[in-house]
């Protein structure tokens, strides 16, 4: 697992991309975004210590939404293998 910093308005990932990581917010705020006919919509605003981006690791589909730093933000990248190992050892976290 590695920490990565993102500046205000920088995308962590974009809708439709393939997934290599889930993320845990260490500091800052992340907006979850989705494109629609009306433009980009903010679906949620997340803060530490929230995990996000895990659905694409679980189902193997492209990212269903984007994630953008709302302010200077630090996240921890979690690989698919690490995430799946954690879930197998902590099944209560999967609900």
Identify the role of each PLM range.
Residues 36-38:
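Solvent-exposed strand-loop boundary residues in beta-sheet-rich modules
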Residues 40-42:
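Short, mixed charged/polar active-site loops
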């Amino acid at each position: 697992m590695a920490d990565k910093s993102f500046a205000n308005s920088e995308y962590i990932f974009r809708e439709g991309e393939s997934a290599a990581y889930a993320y845990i917010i260490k500091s800052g705020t992340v907006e979850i975004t989705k494109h629609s006919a009306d433009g980009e919509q903010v679906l949620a605003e997340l803060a530490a210590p929230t995990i996000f981006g895990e659905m694409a690791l679980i189902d193997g589909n492209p990212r269903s939404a984007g994630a953008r730093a709302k302010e200077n933000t630090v996240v921890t990248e979690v690989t698919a293998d690490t995430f799946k190992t954690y879930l197998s050892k902590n099944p209560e976290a999967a609900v």
